[in-house]
Amino acid sequence: MLLVACLAAPSVLPAQVCLVSKGKAQARIVLAQDNDVNRKAAQLLQRFVRETSGGELPIVANGRRSKNCVVIGESTDEATDDGYVIDCSRGTLAIKTAGDKGAIYGVVALLEKQLGVDYLAKDFYTLTPSADVRIPQMHVAESPAFRFRQTFSYSNNDSTYRDWMRLQEHREMFAADMWVHTFDRLLPSSVYGKSHPEYYSFINGERRPGNHSQWCLTNPDIFEIVAHRIDSIFKANPDQNMISVSQNDGNDTYCQCPECRKVNEYEGSPAGCYVRFLNRLAERFPDKHFSTLAYLFTMHPPKHVKPLPNVNIMLCDIDTKREVPLTDNESGRDFLRALEGWAKISNNIFVWDYGINFDNVVAPFPNFHILKKNIQLFKRNHATMLFEQVNGTLGTDFAELRAYMLGKLMWNPELDADSLMQRFMRGYYGAAAPYLYRYQQMLTGALLASGTPLWIYDSPITHKNGMLNANLRKAYNELFDEAEKAVAADSAMLAHVRIARLPLRYSELEIARTESGGDKAAVEKSLDTFGTICALYGVPTLNERNNKVEDYCRLYRQRFLPNGTKNKAAGAKVIWNIPPQERYQPIADKALTDGLYGGTTFVESWVGWQGEDADFVLDMGEQKQVNKITTDFLHQLGQWILQPKSVAYYASDDAKNFRLLGTHEFPEDRDISVKFVPATVTLSAPVQARYIRVVVKTLGLCPSWHYGVGYPAWFFLDEVVVE
């Protein structure tokens, strides 16, 4: 979608090349070499000159160069790969390339800085119409700060946007799309697990083959199998020379056999085994490049072994908080120690940075103030490649703005972040921009004032007394009301504003379900509005596990709005036989019978046990008739939260002698979606009882297919309902 804008014109300098005069083309585009990149660059220039002025510049390959021609694709050594030179002098405009997509990126820079074109999101750009297009004398050379730049954004599906933001895709670089968590693709546990369990991690006293287990990297047999597999991959992908040989997803699942432990202790980090193994591959294939993760248990570098130059370290800051730059909180400083440690032994670092709330992607995540400082930090510490994993799907918190700012800052970390934000907002939100800018400033200030961390598994409920308190939400809504009024006559801008408001609407719904009383009719109306807007604009999901909006709205009505069910155990006293983990005990006495159901984030309302059974008794205060008992469980595989083996319900009159009412068995469930699982036992005939005992049998250890293979599984429950 095109938005015609009246933007501040670039400073006027003496014209050297006239491309268009009074809507008529005065120049032509000459390809120095006729290849795909140069031709795409030429077509991009041709398109936007035409849309700006009406003049159509012809494109010729290897044609005669004359006055007013635009030469695209000559080589230059004034920049590094992907870089470019724009030289306008002596009546000719030359856009030179330092390699790869340099010609395209040079054209983009020219269009932005001289013609006032801004490509802001998928199929959406702004430009300043002018019947005359003249390029002043200039000589500009630019190189990217990072040789690889990638971020998540639904806008990346638009190839013009992706080129405009100067972004790459990992599949362009990594052979066979082997770019992260590749162990099980290279040495499949489904093939080798049963016959060779010794290839896999030794955890808690035995070998644990599985698709999330790691390799026993001191086993001499593995290397040749993997090397042969890698050789075949490179032969099948002759145009690519990089591959990732990296741990499967999951924490602390590294091998702890005596030989691996000996290396880990000597190196001071499990990363020692990994770097040693990668170095052997790098020596076997000296003309290839090998990437491996420094992630979770391998984040900190080894003390002695150093990666060879063709070993790339993909360092991930997944465990850090996001409310301040990495230098300013303890989790960030721990990562910084790792980054500085790797920087001392390698100049080949790929940083994987996170700016996402995995559990609630449609929730406010005000991290814009830290983007520039963190990217500068990565650059100072030898990072040459950068991936920004952010909330990138449509409807997530200011996804378009975040992707725009990151694209610009990954190319040049010295740009002014606030200016980038305001430029984007003027183009993307039009007359609503001042209100949304004010909203972001207020939200960020409130976050910092609250002292509450911003986490990648966050919940709006965490911030309901801070940046999302009732008074602030009222002020935010007033700003959005004004923003919607300002663009009411522009359907495109109104859509942008309404989508930007979704995180605030979602937060209000999430907070409302944790509060007793209140206007439930108003909450239901808000839920209807949220669902309608999401459906209207095609918002696909609410979290990393792809839970759909329509399912959220349906479950919200079932769980959090009045449904006529009366819990006879409401407010019951809880007597613990096997209490939950200590961190959940402060809420446990009330959370199981307070009538407030937990949401999709385990950090609020849920009560958890890890690796052991649960056993507790509810004292209902008097004899009551019991017909049915239901307990609500959470299923969230990514957090090691699995369904237990079973739950059994017992009844008693005296809290001493209990009789079994029934048992609910849980089937294995590998579904990655976050969901709520009710465990119900319905009695064939009612019984009288004062006490209800609940006994949950743990699954024990996470199974071989799970991220936490070999470690104790969690289960979480919240509400026990007696009918």
Where are these regions (language model features)?
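Bacterial Sec-dependent N-terminal signal peptides
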Residues: 1-18
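Feature activates predominantly on carbohydrate-active enzymes
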Residues: 26, 36, 41-44, 48, ...
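Short, well-ordered secondary-structure micro-motifs within conserved domains or adaptor modules
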Residues: 58-80
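Structured mid-domain segments that build the active-site/substrate or prosthetic-cofactor binding neighborhood
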Residues: 221-222, 333-432, 438
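Acidic, His- and aromatic-enriched active-site or binding-groove loops in soluble protein domains
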Residues: 263-281, 309-328, 408-415
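Substrate-binding cleft/loops of secretory-pathway carbohydrate-active enzymes
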Residues: 291, 295-319, 362-367, 395-403
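Catalytic domains of carbohydrate-active enzymes that cleave complex glycans
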Residues: 409-590
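Aromatic, loop-rich ligand-recognition surfaces of beta-strand-rich domains
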Residues: 598-662, 677-723
